[in-house]
């Protein structure tokens, strides 16, 4: 994860925001006398929120993990997406 200081983030806010959006990667912003913060795109944030929501239910989390295991072991089926 890229790490920058609060001063650098403040001086280059627009460019820092663009980098977070374009790279689809969070940026850690540190402060000298305080806790750090993370800057990320709204798309990445929404994705994390959705994942957390889906994993909140133990049964749903188990189904998702079983599906991932099946895919990794070659038991998945590729299908075309109809838009």
UniProtKB/Swiss-Prot annotation:
<dbReference type="InterPro" id="IPR006442">
    <property type="entry name" value="Antitoxin_Phd/YefM"/>
</dbReference>
<dbReference type="GO" id="GO:0044010">
    <property type="term" value="P:single-species biofilm formation"/>
</dbReference>
<dbReference type="GO" id="GO:0015643">
    <property type="term" value="F:toxic substance binding"/>
</dbReference>
<keyword id="KW-0238">DNA-binding</keyword>
<comment type="subunit">
    <text>In solution exists as both a monomer and a dimer; the monomeric state is more predominant. It has been described as being a YefM-YeoB(2) heterotrimer and as a YefM(2)-YoeB heterotrimer. When complexed with YoeB inhibits the toxin activity.</text>
</comment>
<dbReference type="GO" id="GO:0045892">
    <property type="term" value="P:negative regulation of DNA-templated transcription"/>
</dbReference>
<dbReference type="GO" id="GO:0043565">
    <property type="term" value="F:sequence-specific DNA binding"/>
</dbReference>
<dbReference type="InterPro" id="IPR051405">
    <property type="entry name" value="phD/YefM_antitoxin"/>
</dbReference>
<dbReference type="GO" id="GO:0110001">
    <property type="term" value="C:toxin-antitoxin complex"/>
</dbReference>
<keyword id="KW-0678">Repressor</keyword>
<keyword id="KW-0805">Transcription regulation</keyword>
<dbReference type="GO" id="GO:0040008">
    <property type="term" value="P:regulation of growth"/>
</dbReference>
<comment type="function">
    <text>Antitoxin component of a type II toxin-antitoxin (TA) system. Antitoxin that counteracts the effect of the YoeB toxin. YefM binds to the promoter region of the yefM-yeoB operon to repress transcription, YeoB acts as a corepressor.</text>
</comment>
<dbReference type="GO" id="GO:0003700">
    <property type="term" value="F:DNA-binding transcription factor activity"/>
</dbReference>
<dbReference type="GO" id="GO:0042803">
    <property type="term" value="F:protein homodimerization activity"/>
</dbReference>
<protein>
    <recommendedName>
        <fullName>Antitoxin YefM</fullName>
    </recommendedName>
</protein>
<keyword id="KW-1277">Toxin-antitoxin system</keyword>
<dbReference type="GO" id="GO:0006355">
    <property type="term" value="P:regulation of DNA-templated transcription"/>
</dbReference>
<dbReference type="Pfam" id="PF02604">
    <property type="entry name" value="PhdYeFM_antitox"/>
</dbReference>
<comment type="similarity">
    <text>Belongs to the phD/YefM antitoxin family.</text>
</comment>
<keyword id="KW-0804">Transcription</keyword>
<dbReference type="InterPro" id="IPR036165">
    <property type="entry name" value="YefM-like_sf"/>
</dbReference>
